[in-house]
Amino acid sequence: MVPYFEMAAASNFSFLCGASHPQELVERAHALDLSGIGIADRNTLAGVVRAHAQWKDIRKESGFRLFIGCRLSFIDGTPDMVVYPRDRAAYGQLCRLLTEGKHRAAIKGECHLEWADLLFRARQFQIAVFPPDEDEPDFAARLTEIAQAAPGSVWLALTMPHQGQDGRRAERIARFAAQAGVPLIATNDVLYHHPDRRPLQDVLTATRHHTTVFAAGRLLEKNAERHLKPPHEMVRLFRDYPEAIAATADFVAPITFQLDELKYAYPDEPIPPGKTAQQHLYDLVWEGAARHYGADMIPPKVQGLINKELALIARLEYEPYFLTVYDIVTHAREKGILCQGRGSAANSVVCFCLGITGVNPTQVDLLFERFISAERKEPPDIDVDFEHERREEVMQYVYDRYSRDRAAIVATVISYRSRSAIRDVGKALGLSEDVTAALANTVWGLSGGGIDRQHIRQAGLDPDNPIIQRAVELAITLIGFPRHLSQHVGGFVLTRDRLDETVPIGPAAMDKRSFIEWDKDDIDEVGLMKVDVLSLGMLTCIRKAFDLIHQHKPQLYGGEKLTLASLPRKDKAVYDMLCKGDSLGVFQVESRAQMNMLPRLRPQEFYDLVIEVAIVRPGPIQGDMVHPYLRRRSGQEPCTLPSPSPQHGPANELQQILGKTKGVPLFQEQAMRIAMEAAKFTPEEANQLRRAMATFRKMGTIHTMEKKMIDGMVNRGYDRTFAENCFNQIKGFGEYGFPESHAASFAHLVYISAWLKCHHPEVFAAALLNSQPMGFYAPAQIVRDAREHGVTVLPVDVNFSQWDNILEETPDVHLALRLGFRQIDGFSKRDTELLIADRQEPYRTIEDMHRRLRLDRRAFTLLADADAFGSLDIDRRAALWAVRRLPNDETLPLFRAAAASELAQEPRTKLPEMAASEHVIADYETTRLSLKGHPLQYLREGLAAEGVSTCRAVQEGADGRRMKVAGVVTVRQRPGSAKGVVFLTIEDETGIANIVIWPKIMKVFRREVMSARLIHIEGRIQRSLEGVVHLVAAKLQDRSAALIEMSGREAQRLIAPSQMAHHPRNVRVMPNSRDFH
């Protein structure tokens, strides 16, 4: 068979052009018996690692080859060409070429290249030039210029596109080749692996050009021929040009480069003179241990762990990595930025002694092999969280220290999910906006799954309509396709040499940031190390709370500012509060499921919080671990563990591993330990088990470990049924298994945030509000909870408020929470600064403010809408009328003062008072909360007439009782572990109620569940022994119209009819619920 290499294959990383995944192209090319394939996406190398990973499995059994290249498109008229680097040095030059083009482009994601960029590099590549579709007078000269720049390395691409004039077109291209003295090379210029993908490629093309498939015309491919074809078919097509087929082998002959050649070198860290990196790390670790435990009081266990870890770190030469993370964390702390390491790094006593993590190895039994293992060739991965509002300072420090040639953020591939796929396919097929929106709304959240026929019918559409069917089919295929690249949340790659010679780097949309073209899985595949500089809103909240305590209560805690390490521990009041499920706003335990679990688990010590964090996760739930643990914890079920045969090990072998979790494996580390102790896995095999657990839903590889583990346990004397049950529990972890070290790191913040809520509720509420957006709950729920805990909350006021929510002393309360201007939707920080700067004397009237401030009328209107003129003895309606009478913004200052003076002398018009209900709705519309009441209290009379109870009555209701309730939806949840069950949290003037919606009810009332702001529910009370109450829904009604009516009455009084459609109150009556999936 004649060898044929397809050297111009574009994957779907040629965004909105290629219609196949890189893996599909490689797999199909091998199945068709091609000799090899070249992946060449347009101005990017983003998809090559995925192709490489697929090819690695194939090459073991055949001589099939993969070539890493790129299709270059130029902005100066140079024809397109595919280029392939011959060796590692040439590959580095290709990366730098693309990096230069990306930084030159003004728009993120584009790459602007010119011929001059390639000219001095051309001799390092194999180049295939693509002729233009139409005659271009200067193409022959261009081709000759390219050929002269890289003698012997340039070919002219020849295709047979089945467009009716292939013969004549081929003759024209052959003449060009002869004139320039370059050979022809055959290619099918592939856009997809199989002809079935042609319709999807049409959709992608229409989306790229912002048109529809029906209006795209010649922008679309004329047929479905641009797919991978077998060698015999290519030989037939090019029978008149056999030399073009043979040329594919000549083209690839000099190419030796593969991604396996990329060798990572971690940057050298500065160390004190006379020391090695190993000595410097050794000194820092022991100094940290002395600080934590006392110089002569380091426990022997800790000493042994330190020596063990340092020896392994030295053996693997990872010292620079630890020194880098130590330096970043130290810099943050010097700047007063809270930070804490988490994840598998919390298994390391070295990380604890360096101050990177907060998990004390004497509190938690660590498994260092979960973090670093000599047997597996994986770099360590340390995740460090920083305050989310100050994380950027840390990131810029990293850029400054390592330079932008050697440091960049990892990419995130933004892929199509169900909703985005439906929207783009709908637009491309010309569906109306309302039909496309209806289809998209059949999908919950950001689902990556399919689209249910029943949901389509519920949306008022016909699932048997051919156009709807076509749209659904194409959308399902499109799900998972890359849409574009973005930056990772904070993962940095740092290198000793130029990073832009390993992977192209481009500018991020965010100023002063740059990111590489590969995501975290790609860099794992090629062996690049990553430092994660992540953000966590709760750290911001805690730091702001510490600042407020130090500012307003300096006499406490010895006058010292609190830190993450200095907070009082073992506080019974904190655990008593959590046992009641009183955890709104508390880190990691504020969800509905966690609030329900707290009274059942009843935490009494720190390790209970570690379990609390981990147990309400899909892994333990799907592994059927939750109920056995709770039964054993409460003494309802004995905790008995089998033993191996006496000759194989101690009787308490499993007790040592599972004793603290009542015989139930809750953590990945326990699963690894069971494999190592009970089945005698090596550390490397145990890590393979961990990886199989993490990926079995995608890869299905965990079954390969099943026989080995079960047989290993049986051979050591364990009962086979027990071994099988044990493995099934571990398998239930799936991709959701939670590391104990990670849970311990988070439990640290659970305790701290709970302590703040327990002892300083006004401080905690202010810090939470000042750290938004974060967490499960909106400002209205945070303020309601604070008031229930005895906090006095004061409204936004022009004479007292700051940008942030602050604490202020009042005659009858030591500290009250004053709402800040940040709570007013649309009011800017700049306007706040102007308002505060001129507030040495109180503002007396709106006209006085207008005279003194250079705020535009919009700012005054926002303040009036928010009822922020209370200290001026003027309410919302009067303030809005006063603002309307102010001079126009264009009035010159001299005349503005005169006009304001005149206005101030006019008597105020007596206006009818706003109804209390109108005030409440207006509060929600402007500040997202109200201190004057709740919308439901103004609907209560009508609801009571219907027999609708309050949320408080539901909480007090007897088990099994049927009740009706209505409330504003604040949270929607559909956890992946809940098997289709949906949970709602609703709120009225008396509190909250928790609603459970079973899948069969969800099918009937899907639209109401997904879209209602105010919802009416009939159902039956379900009360647990621990007092956790749910209302199990049977019927639901959307009553949102009642809220709109309450808002509309006031809007009609103040706004001309022609403006009604544009008024913000018609956009949102109540804040959106917070939905979690």
Swiss-Prot record:
Its EC number is 2.7.7.7. GO terms for biological process: DNA repair; DNA replication. Coiled coil: none annotated. Its main location: cytoplasm. One of its GO terms (molecular function) is DNA-directed DNA polymerase activity. The keyword Transit peptide does not apply. Keywords: Cytoplasm, DNA damage, DNA repair, DNA replication, DNA-directed DNA polymerase, Nucleotidyltransferase, Transferase. It is an enzyme of class 2 (transferase). Belongs to the DNA polymerase type-C family. DnaE2 subfamily. This is Error-prone DNA polymerase. The lineage of its organism: Bacteria, Pseudomonadati, Pseudomonadota, Alphaproteobacteria, Hyphomicrobiales.
